[in-house]
Amino acid sequence: MNLTVVNHPLVQHKLGLLREGDISTNKFRTITHELARLLAYEATRDFELEPITIDGWCGKIEVQQIKGKKVTVVPILRAGLGMLDGVLDLVPSAKISVVGLYRNEETLEPVPYFDKFVDSLDERIALIIDPMLATGGSMVATIDLLKRKGCKSIRAIVMVAAPEGIKVVNEAHPDVPVFTASLDSHLNEQGYIIPGLGDAGDKIFGTKHS
């Protein structure tokens, strides 16, 4: 299984705060930002480096820089936007691509309604961000879109995942690693992660789930 559960104490502490049932919109946004940054740190841990020579204060000096491919961050709309700034804290030069999907509440299948990708995806590392990986349908659809556009290096960053969704993603795209703060118990009959976080999109945007 191509899955990394990040067990860092700060990650687990912040995840626990997000699980509070009566959490305010402001607090949920703030902690989502912080957690996204920590998860992105883990997801970029093995980026390849190369030495370059620069003019330092005392003359020429050799330093390390990220080698080769540049990053595009791909939030899945709308909830993925809540994680965007946290990831950009670490990779501020990253270009942003977006994918718009919503879940059909009857079939639980993803329905695409918008996408906009940066150029030269074949030369980039894509970091897909979405707070919840539930059924896996939206993540698989997003990976499908990226691969059709030529992207060969893709990673997924989610705050909470369900075993059912991880299984779907791994079966469809075993080459795509998933980074999460928690692999939760299961999905309920409505396709929500248990114990999960509730509706992350509604909590980030301050809207009510109908």
From Swiss-Prot:
Keywords, in A-Z order: Allosteric enzyme, Glycosyltransferase, GTP-binding, Magnesium, Nucleotide-binding, Transferase
Alphabetical list of Pfam families matching this protein: UPRTase (PF14681)
Cofactor: Mg(2+)
Residues that hold 5-phospho-alpha-D-ribose 1-diphosphate according to the record: 78, 103, 130-138, 199
Assigned EC number: 2.4.2.9
Record family assignment: Belongs to the UPRTase family.
Identification of the protein by name: Uracil phosphoribosyltransferase
Source organism of this protein record: Laribacter hongkongensis (strain HLHK9)
Gene from which the chain derives: upp
